């Protein structure tokens, strides 16, 4: 089956609900997002992709000379009923758009084996596997997983209300840490 989708730059709010419904994380809260793309079948949104600054402070230094040289592919999600190779089609179109319309040099993405991902789609899109992250941990709270930095988020020097609730839950035993496997790191060079 031939892929006949349109790839369009969109605003964050155009894809927020779609990502929250279809991506395994069910969230884009807290993401630094620079570019958003929608994958459309006619007027129907069937996929979303979000690029932004790397989640880890100063991690960009491994890949570029300055922070603006590097973006992370933060979210990629398509509905299940798309033809084979739709993900690589979508990635390829967004990479070409970024190369034509930005000065970004490097795209970094992570494949999370904790969700059964090994990076097949990145290898199919000519990303280079450059290693693994360190093992991490998440916080299980109210039946959901949260990044362990959720207990450190501050606003004007004070812990945010949600961070206080999670910290209290850890203290009283209603939340707990769970170890995570290291993630695969993939890199795509847009330009030298």
Model-derived segments and spans:
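A short, polar/charged loop/turn motif at coil->beta-strand junctions and beta-hairpin connectors
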Residues: 1, 13, 45, 65-67, ...
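Short amphipathic alpha-helix that is part of the acyltransferase structural core
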Residues: 1-31
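Acyl-donor binding region in acyl/amide transferases
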Residues: 6-9, 52-172
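Conserved beta-hairpin
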Residues: 19, 33-53
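Short, P/G- and charge-enriched loop/turn segments at secondary-structure junctions
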Residues: 25-26, 169-176
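A short, compositionally biased
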Residues: 31-34, 133-134
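Short hydrophobic/aromatic beta-strand or adjacent loop that forms the aromatic wall/cage
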Residues: 34, 181-186
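Short beta-strand-to-coil "C-cap" segments at the C-terminal boundary of structured domains/repeats
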Residues: 187-192
């Amino acid at each position: 089956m031939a892929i006949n989708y349109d790839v369009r730059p969109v605003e964050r709010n155009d894809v927020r609900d779609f990502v929250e419904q279809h991506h395994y994380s069910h969230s884009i809260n807290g993401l630094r997002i620079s570019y958003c793309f929608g994958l459309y079948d006619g007027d129907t949104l069937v996929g979303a992709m979000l690029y932004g600054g790397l989640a880890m402070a100063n991690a960009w230094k491994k890949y570029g000379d300055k922070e603006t040289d590097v973006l992370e592919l933060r979210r990629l999600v398509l509905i299940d009923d798309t033809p084979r190779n739709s993900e690589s089609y979508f990635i390829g179109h967004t990479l070409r758009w970024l190369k034509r319309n930005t000065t970004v040099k490097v795209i970094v993405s992570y494949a999370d084996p904790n969700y059964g991902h090994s990076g097949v789609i990145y290898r199919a899109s000519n990303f280079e596997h450059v290693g693994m992250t360190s093992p991490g941990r998440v916080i299980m709270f109210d039946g959901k997983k949260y990044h362990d930095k959720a207990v450190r988020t501050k606003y004007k020097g004070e812990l945010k209300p949600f961070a206080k609730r999670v910290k209290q839950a850890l203290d009283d035993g209603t939340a707990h840490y769970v170890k995570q496997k290291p993630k695969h790191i993939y890199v795509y060079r847009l330009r030298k």
